Amino acid sequence: MKKIFFLIIFLSFSVIGREQGQTEITTEEGIEVFQKEKYYLLKKNVLIESDEFILSADLVKAFFEKDLYDIQKIESEGNVNFTSSKGYNGVGERLDFSMKNNLMNNFGNNALLNMENLIMKSDNYIMIDDSKGKFKLEGNISELTTDTMNIIGSSINGSYEEINDINEINNLIVKSDKITEITTDTLKMFSSKAVYSKKDNIIELFDNVKVIRNNEIIIGDYARINTLNESYKVSSNESKKVKVLIDSTDE
């Protein structure tokens, strides 16, 4: 009887239309409520609209506290699309979101999270902890795009902060089983591992290092790049030699 009662509430909200402070939920195959465990299941073409977020998915498991509309955590699967009140947009095969902790875990072969000036893509997993300003991307191919850089690697870990409504990267650690790639307007940087510090305005490259600028290619074991003027130094630990290739071909 409770399931029917709650479902009637959902349908009545859909007819009346959502007002500020309300949560509107629509689903084609109804709702299954687990009152003791404080969660409910929504199946097939689920749409949840609230002041904080809009989410659509094939299946949603919603955890609540006081009542069904007091949603604290969501676990969603199948064609997930999520938009927050801050303008963040997430797409994935599975997406878990905690309203209490502002923690999002996005899974899928084409997982995507768009934070306006920060765009994250992965073929496996993206994590955002918005309360602490931390993020993680894990997969065979993970990609982070900012206003000034494009970063590709298997593992991308970092932190960010919001300054004047813009998310700025503070720190980055990029690793890859193959080669990481960092691209700016004037430089292409390759290595097995890369570390970025906004405080020091430095990018460090470790192992299998290659730095390309215009027709110049420098190869070594370690590089240190100043992000303000993009000057750099490349060194070699083992061979004590740095290889420089210059293409002087006239166009």
Where are these regions (language model features)?
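Mature-chain termini and adjacent capping regions
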Residues: 1-251
